[in-house]
């Protein structure tokens, strides 16, 4: 069964990133976190390079792409931690530029950026803020929502009180 990416939506400061960190720690998997507003199409897909090729006995030149900075970071994390499974967490997913959105949709659907795939054993989680909290945020269309399992987060006084009591927080 193919795991659909998880999409956490909620106001700024609600703890979306901390939730992913806690899940990774408690399950013993790796975590690579990226804020997508800091990326361009090139850093997500990789940079073009010209390579020499041969086909049907003829030489020609073609364009290939270096590995995505994001995918490369996952492999670096795997090497550093020796963990073969993990979560690629894409934050502020609904604030990316229009030129990057097709690559993001490809990642959500196929677990690839360009021609480079997310390693087996890694899943995608993403987060965003509803547009009412961020002028740069946009609502997702149905094509995007069909690719993810959405979870809406909101503040809860009871949850905060339980957390505060467990961690010695008091006025």
Predicted regions: what they are:
Residues 1-171:
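AAA+ P-loop NTPase catalytic core and its hallmark functional loops
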